[in-house]
Design a protein with these regions (language model features):
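Helix-start/capping segments and mature chain N-termini
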Residues: 1-33, 125, 151-154, 164-186
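Bacterial peptidoglycan biogenesis and beta-lactam-recognition machinery
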Residues: 1-3, 17-19, 25-37, 70-75, ...
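Solvent-exposed coil/turn segments that connect beta secondary-structure elements
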Residues: 6-8, 13-17, 56-58, 70, ...
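Residue-level detector of short, conserved catalytic/binding motifs and their immediate flanks
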Residues: 8, 92, 191
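A short, polar/charged loop-to-alpha-helix boundary motif
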Residues: 9-24, 211-231
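Solvent-exposed, acidic/flexible segments
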Residues: 16-21, 46, 54-62, 87, ...
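Small/polar-residue-rich segments within soluble enzyme cores
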Residues: 25-29, 43-162
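Active-site loop and adjoining helix of the penicillin-binding protein/serine DD-peptidase-beta-lactamase fold
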Residues: 157-202, 206, 218-248
Length: 248
């Protein structure tokens, strides 16, 4: 249901960029990115620190950057792991989604393993089992100069994967259930169905309509997509199976 796939993320190291305005202008003709947000990130960061331009760029965008790397100094691509919801919106309310950790959460938990910009479970099982799914970050001990520039690496510690979560959900039952709901429930209506083993309480399938695609959250949801979800009168983010209130 959920896996990790490589995402191609586009970065900028300002001090290596040469004519930064020219490079970003050329880049913006082929790749859409938030230039104002990038400028704010650059203002907060030192010029030798890389700054994310855009996450999870397409293969076509990767090809453009690679083909023009000589005229885009300081701009480079890194392959990094990204959460992948294999069946898109299937069981989305049960699985939940990821989102960037808020400043409030950072201040409240004071967990040194988190920093601003990290993605954490925001809802569903992603949120409930965040502590066991997140694993441990890799890090390295380095020698730096007075400005904080890295001179050499002293020791490296590889990252540790999080635990796997085994569910009682039956994918085939879940697929048939959601297919049946979409075939019988009007697009402008809502509803939910839960299939359980009475003897054990195991949840075999849990569907809520309308649903959403958690992949849109994995690398940071756009303001347009977020507004479309929260402004929808049928509240697709609500799990009606467990959060709805209904008359007897």
């Amino acid at each position: 249901l959920v896996s990790i796939r490589p995402a191609f993320n586009l970065y900028l190291t300002p001090e290596d960029a040469g004519d930064l305005t020219s490079s970003l202008d050329k880049l913006s003709h082929k790749i859409f990115f938030d230039q104002e947000k990038l400028k704010k990130e650059m203002a907060r960061s030192k010029s030798f620190k890389e700054v994310l331009i855009k996450g999870d760029i397409s293969r076509k965008e990767v090809a453009f950057v690679e083909e023009n790397n000589m005229s885009l100094p300081g701009i480079h691509i890194k392959a990094e792991p990204l959460r992948n919801y294999v069946f898109n919106s299937l069981a989305s309310h049960t699985l939940g989604y990821l989102g960037e950790i808020s400043k409030t959460s950072l201040e409240r938990h004071k967990d040194p393993s988190y920093k601003q910009g990290d993605f954490v479970g925001k809802n569903g099982l992603e949120n409930i089992y965040e502590s066991v799914l997140k694993g441990e970050k890799g890090y390295k001990e380095v020698e730096v100069d007075v400005s904080g520039r890295e001179l050499k690496a002293l020791r490296k510690f590889p990252p540790q994967s999080g635990a796997n979560l085994h569910l009682t959900l039956d994918v085939r039952v879940q697929q048939e259930l959601e297919k049946a709901m979409k075939g019988t429930v009007d697009q402008n209506m809502n509803g939910s169905v839960v299939v359980m083993k009475v003897q054990t309480g195991e949840v075999i399938a849990m569907a809520s309509n309308p649903s959403f695609d958690p992949n849109k959250f994995a690398s940071g949801i756009s303001p347009e997509n977020w507004n479309a979800l929260v402004d929808d009168e049928w509240h697709p983010l609500q799990n009606r199976s467990i959060h709805g209130q209904y008359p007897p």
